């Protein structure tokens, strides 16, 4: 388990501290928050991978899921992407990544996301022809780890 600090804080996306990175490498269920068309939050459990070098978080999803529909609707309305957040916690430790999401359908991008998922969660996702990638370009990181 990652060492604990005493204060929550904004994390520098250009230079996240090792305890924060370690916390994102550990296996745990996360949440993804998207916004419904009426602006209310839709929060669902997901697996997330974090690529600090690219400043990207990735979530695999089914093409027909509500989270994908929310991202598509918001991205169309807002331009470059839908505002989303992914979060994970254990005890008093927590980490949140915020950013702009878009849906990726390219097989190579999905395969890379599956590889990263397997690396973090220890198993390859089962085959799914309806799989898409929610790719989040990160704008903010917060946490207490």
Give names to the regions the model predicted.
Residues 20, 28, 55, 93, ...:
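A generic secondary-structure signal marking the coil-to-beta-strand transition
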Residues 2-15, 91-145:
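Charged, gly/pro-rich active-site loop segments
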Residues 76, 80-86:
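A short, hydrophobic beta-strand micro-motif
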